[in-house]
Amino acid sequence: WRKEVERLCGEFPEVQTIAVEMPGFAMQMAGLVYGELGSPGRYHKEKAYAKATGLTPGSRKTGGKEQQRCISRAGSRHARWAFTRAVIACLRCKHGPGAQVRAWVEKQCRRQKCKRKVIVAAARKLAEGVWRLLAWGEAFDLRKAFPT
């Protein structure tokens, strides 16, 4: 079934672009993300694309104060899973493009101490990068997205 999925995903150049350019993505996961979220032209900016995955933080306003809350989970749970799995795959990389993501996550964990929150933040950065890659054709710059 994997060969069949790869054959079907190969018919869409956007899926191939995600699988080749983005760290941590295989052809199946790229196909899942593209199938769940559709064309990035549907979203007016990268924040809207990230919001469709449910990876953006929720907020609560009361008494003139705004509090950041946990992620909204308002989007596609399958796409959210794919982006977090891509980050977890990068955490296993010691060399190559995933190593930059790993270094950023480790640096943030030393500062914030909560690994799950850092993984979600990295997944949101990947989601925004996918939107820029497909909507504008802009190459994903790991050093800009994940400075260490």
Q: Where are the regions a protein language model picked out?
A:
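A detector of single, family-specific signature residues
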Residues: 1-148
